[in-house]
Structures are given as structure tokens and as C-alpha cells.
């Protein structure tokens, strides 16, 4: 840029801010508006290739006003809890009113999934790249994948849909904490690859089935605690159903995680000239694969068979996914930690959540022994 263009680039902003100060005193904003229009014309002349179009600007303004993912965590919480309460009432006393209520909740949760999908499409259109490139986007993508698999596996299981809605609310709540930046930004150069569409989409989406398996494990333990002599037959049927769906979810998740890991090796070879380098993300992805392979095959070990131990294992195994994602991105140094850019933090609720799960496992085992283990 030479001559007048160079001078304009150097002086435009200081001149604009000075004119704003003067306009504030005189209440006449004609001059700042003129300078702003000149800046806009200059940007279009020299930066038209990178400037967003008017339609994208309008779309981003609408997206920010709607703030769909911030709203959805509240909606998912409300209808997930309401649906779960309705299902518990169904177990004890079924009737047309409660059946209709549960069906309405299920339809509403489906509509929330459509809204999530539209929100991701909007981010994709506005940014010009796949919406799973930073910490915030990857979390909302995990939430989307969790709801997708929850609705797919729970077509005939209302408890699965209710559990999915509840865990989606938790994920979206985490995404909207102040230590994550929801701003739509440009793509990090190392992610500017077609592998973003393939590797990242597959491996991050695999966290969805694992998350579903975790929340189904929690739901099964709660059902065990709610079991009594009068409802044992219905509870046993629901526990078997959720455990079967849990096994299916973990199997799908393991397949996706394994495929995603191999695809990551291909990308690593193109980017860094090696397929495997024991980077923290690579290592923990491998650890997660081994842990979930063990959990899925526990039923083949006589001493590790049983619905209680399987569901507890599906909850505990999720810790490896948390380490693979949050631990590596926020705490460890490696080639994959560029994606976060945030200050490492361990929210206090994590410790309370772990304590709650331990207590839940212990109490549920007492009821499991009482109602489901045959006494010899």
C-alpha cells in the first residue's frame, strides 16, 4: 500500500476516535459517520477477499441475538427432568395422561436437537469452516453428537431420551462457562486441512456415544436404588433395556474412536512427517481405546459379569475421555493443546460430582445385592 492509502491506514482510526470525542461534546455525529464510511470503503477495496459478506454479517448478528446454545442448556434441563419424572410415574402407575406427557416431552427434545443442528450449521456458514475447531465449538459438537446418538438409540426407550437431554444440558452448561470463548474466529493454520472434516469430526463425535453410555450407567444405578418388591419386574426390564443400549453406545463409540485415531495418524504424517509420536493426545486416545475395549469385553470374564459392574465401569471409563479431551487440551503440553488457548482450571463441581458418583455406586450396589443377586 503506497501514498494516500498508506497515510489513510495510519491516521484513520486515531482521526475517527478524536471525531467521536468531539461529537460527544457537540452531539453532532456527522463527521464520525463520514470517516466510518470511508474506513468501510477502504476495507472493501483492500480486504474484500477476507471480509465477510453482508449476508454472513446479518447471520452472525442473528446468531448472537438468538444465542441458541446458551438457551438450550436451560430447555434441555427443564424437559429432561420433566420427562424423567413422568417416566418414573409411568413405572409406578401408568395412564394415558402421563403417557401423553412423556410423548410431548420427547417431541420437544427432538425439536431442541433440530435447533442444535441449525445452530451448528449457522456457525459453519458464518465462519466458513467446520464448527469443531476450538474448545467451545468442540464441546457443543460433543453435545450435538450425544443428543444424536441418544435419539437414535432411544427411539423406543424414553429413559434413554430423558437421560440424553439431561447430560446434553450439562455439556452445554459447561460450554457456556466464562472460561470458554464462544466467539466465532478464524481457523488456526494447522487446522486448515481437509482432515479437519474427517479426523476431528469422527474422533470428537465418538465422545457422544461414550457420554451417552456414561449417563445411561448413572440412570441404571438410580433405577436400582428405586427398586422395591412391587416394581422389581418393571425396573428389571428397564435396567436390561438401558444396559443393552449402553453396550451398543460404547461399541459404536469405540469403533469411531479407533477409526478416528487411525485417521489422526494419517493427518500427523502429512503435517509432521510421522504417524505416531506419543503426543499426550495420541497417548490418551490409545489409553481410552484400551479401557473401553476392556469394558465392552468384561461380560466374557465370569467374575466381571453383571449389570451393576458393567454400568459402574461405563461411568468410570468416561474419566479417560475427560482426560483425553480436557486433560490434554487444558493441562498438558503437546501438539494438540493449541486448540484450547484457555487458562487451565478445574471447576469445584468436578470434585462434588466424583464424590456423588462414588456414593451412588455404593448405595446402588446395596440394592443390587438385595433385589438382583440370587442368594444361594
Give the location of each predicted region.
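Soluble extramembrane regions of membrane proteins in the secretory/endomembrane system
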Residues: 1-62
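Cytosolic-side membrane-insertion boundary helix
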Residues: 51-81
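Hydrophobic cores of alpha-helical transmembrane segments in multi-pass integral membrane proteins
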Residues: 69-94, 102-129, 133-185, 195-225, ...
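Solvent-exposed interhelical
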Residues: 97
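Interhelical loops and loop-helix junctions of multi-pass membrane transporters/channels
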Residues: 188-192
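Membrane-interface interhelical connector segments
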Residues: 226-242
Amino acid at each position: 500500500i503506497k501514498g494516500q492509502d498508506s497515510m489513510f491506514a495510519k491516521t484513520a482510526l486515531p482521526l475517527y476516535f478524536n471525531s467521536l470525542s468531539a461529537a460527544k461534546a457537540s452531539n453532532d455525529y456527522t463527521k464520525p459517520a463520514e470517516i466510518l464510511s470511508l474506513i468501510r470503503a477502504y476495507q472493501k477495496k483492500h480486504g474484500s477477499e477476507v471480509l465477510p459478506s453482508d449476508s454472513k454479517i446479518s447471520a452472525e448478528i442473528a446468531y448472537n441475538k438468538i444465542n441458541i446454545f446458551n438457551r438450550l442448556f436451560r430447555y434441555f434441563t427443564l424437559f429432561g427432568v420433566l420427562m424423567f419424572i413422568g417416566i418414573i410415574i409411568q413405572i409406578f402407575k401408568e395412564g394415558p395422561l402421563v403417557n401423553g406427557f412423556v410423548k410431548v416431552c420427547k417431541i420437544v427434545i427432538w425439536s431442541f436437537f433440530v435447533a442444535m443442528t441449525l445452530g451448528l450449521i449457522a456457525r459453519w456458514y458464518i465462519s466458513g469452516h467446520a464448527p469443531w475447531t476450538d474448545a467451545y465449538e468442540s464441546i457443543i459438537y460433543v453435545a450435538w453428537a450425544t443428543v444424536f446418538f441418544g435419539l437414535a438409540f432411544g427411539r423406543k426407550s424414553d429413559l434413554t431420551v430423558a437421560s440424553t437431554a439431561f447430560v446434553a444440558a450439562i455439556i452445554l452448561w459447561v460450554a457456556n462457562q466464562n472460561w470458554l470463548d464462544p466467539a466465532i474466529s478464524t481457523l488456526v493454520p494447522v487446522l486448515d486441512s481437509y482432515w479437519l472434516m474427517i479426523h476431528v469430526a469422527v474422533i470428537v463425535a465418538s465422545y457422544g456415544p461414550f457420554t451417552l453410555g456414561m449417563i445411561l450407567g448413572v440412570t441404571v444405578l438410580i433405577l436400582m436404588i428405586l427398586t422395591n418388591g412391587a416394581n422389581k419386574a418393571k425396573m428389571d426390564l428397564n435396567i436390561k433395556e438401558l444396559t443393552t443400549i449402553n453396550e451398543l453406545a460404547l461399541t459404536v463409540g469405540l469403533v469411531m474412536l479407533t477409526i478416528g485415531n487411525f485417521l489422526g495418524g494419517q493427518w500427523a504424517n502429512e503435517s509432521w512427517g510421522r504417524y505416531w509420536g506419543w503426543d499426550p493426545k495420541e497417548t490418551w486416545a490409545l489409553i481410552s481405546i484400551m479401557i473401553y475395549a476392556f469394558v465392552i469385553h468384561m461380560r466374557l470374564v465370569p467374575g466381571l459379569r453383571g449389570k451393576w459392574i458393567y454400568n459402574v465401569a461405563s461411568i468410570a471409563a468416561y474419566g479417560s475421555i475427560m482426560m483425553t479431551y480436557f486433560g490434554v487440551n487444558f493441562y498438558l503440553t503437546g501438539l494438540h493443546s493449541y486448540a484450547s488457548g484457555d487458562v487451565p482450571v478445574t471447576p469445584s463441581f468436578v470434585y462434588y460430582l466424583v464424590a456423588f458418583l462414588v456414593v451412588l455406586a455404593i448405595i446402588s450396589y446395596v440394592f443390587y445385592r438385595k433385589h438382583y443377586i440370587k442368594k444361594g
